[in-house]
Amino acid sequence: MYPAHLLVLLAVCVSLLGASDIPPLPLNLYQFDNMIQCANKGKRATWHYMDYGCYCGSGGSGTPVDALDRCCKAHDDCYGVAEDNGCYPKWTLYSWQCTENVPTCNSESGCQKSVCACDATAAKCFAEAPYNNKNYNINTSNCQ
């Protein structure tokens, strides 16, 4: 084997070892992303919702800043109810379809049904709520 091939093989092995320490993105978030794109007709990238207001993104506190932020708080609360019922919303996969920009759940029972309902309701809410650029990446220390 050529020395260059050995270096490439070594680099691949080392990078794979390092990648094992990176936590995977929860599986359900891929579905939620697709639901959001279904409902908003792809008009706004999902990352715009990841750091918006006091509730859109990781965690949340205080009073929502507007209708879109209220959608995120409702979604957080919905996931909280699902967790109280023994579900793991960020890891629960479910069956759904997009018909004429309306996400519809096909899952019929248990955690799949409740988590899908949380995501579908939020995706529809996001699509209907106005997006205010001033509320993107706000200082969340003001969220009281």
UniProtKB/Swiss-Prot annotation:
- Disulfide connectivity for this sequence is 38-98, 54-143, 56-72, 71-125, 78-118, 87-111, 105-116
Propeptide segment residues: 20-27
Q: Which residues form the signal peptide?
A: 1-19
Q: Which GO terms describe its cellular component?
A: extracellular region
EC number(s) per entry:
3.1.1.4
Where does the record place it? Secreted
Any one Pfam family here would be Phospholip_A2_1
Cofactor(s) demanded: Ca(2+)
User: Which UniProt keywords are given for this protein, alphabetically ordered?
Assistant: Calcium, Disulfide bond, Hydrolase, Lipid degradation, Lipid metabolism, Metal-binding, Secreted, Signal
Residues bound to Ca(2+) are 55, 57, 59, 76
Question: What parts of the sequence cross the membrane?
Answer: none
Q: What is its main location?
A: secreted
User: What's a BP term from Gene Ontology annotated to this protein?
Assistant: lipid catabolic process
Tissue specificity is: Expressed by the venom gland.
Cofactor: binding comment: Binds 1 Ca(2+) ion.
Q: Does the keyword Disulfide bond apply?
A: yes
Matches recorded under Gene3D superfamilies: Phospholipase A2 domain
* InterPro entries for the chain: PLipase_A2, PLipase_A2_Asp_AS, PLipase_A2_dom, PLipase_A2_dom_sf, PLipase_A2_His_AS
Q: Which reaction does it catalyse?
A: a 1,2-diacyl-sn-glycero-3-phosphocholine + H2O = a 1-acyl-sn-glycero-3-phosphocholine + a fatty acid + H(+)
Keyword Hydrolase set for record: yes
Q: Which family does it belong to?
A: Belongs to the phospholipase A2 family. Group I subfamily. D49 sub-subfamily.
UniProt xrefs under PANTHER family: PHOSPHOLIPASE A2 (PTHR11716:SF51), PHOSPHOLIPASE A2 FAMILY MEMBER (PTHR11716)
Function comment:
PLA2 catalyzes the calcium-dependent hydrolysis of the 2-acyl groups in 3-sn-phosphoglycerides.
Instruction: Quote the protein name from its UniProt record.
Output: Acidic phospholipase A2
